[in-house]
Amino acid sequence: MVFGIGSSGLAAVRALHAAGFEVFAGDDNQERREETEKSGAKWVSDPLEFDYKTLSAVVLAPGIPLHFPVPHPVCNLAVAAGCPLISDIELFGLAQTGHNPIVAITGTNGKSTTTALIAHILNQLGMTAVAGGNIGKNALDLPQYEDGKGTYVIEISSFQIDLCPRFRPDIAVLLNITPD
């Protein structure tokens, strides 16, 4: 299930549907239902009544609270059912075939500037690099490169990192940590 249908949620729906998965989707807001169903998902009208034991994972949008100020009820239901919670970035990492370097940037301030700058420098050096994640295109909407033909420079929020148990970028950049 994809829960939280903003731009990253829709990208996750499209990616999972394109990969042949049966996709369920939900949101506290019903406004994106039609667009979500057109993208290949079955809409879950009441996520609080859904059987999470039937799922492989729940992909949470970055804005869905996992811990603070309190977990969203969907998080509690999924965890109680033994269903893993993951982010779109985790899904992006799992979808990679072959080896194309991934540079992941996080921190309180300066993520977007650093992400854009690294991608620009790599491109100026003659490499093929694309910036995405929380800057520009969602990670799951980035082009799929042939093995070794491109570098992904991804801006990642702390909320997404919490839900990336297997994501292993080739380079990780932690800019700073300050109260926000």
Stretches with model-predicted labels:
Residues 1-87, 91:
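N-terminal leader/targeting and accessory segments in enzymes
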Residues 53, 66-180:
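Phosphate-binding loop of NTP-binding sites
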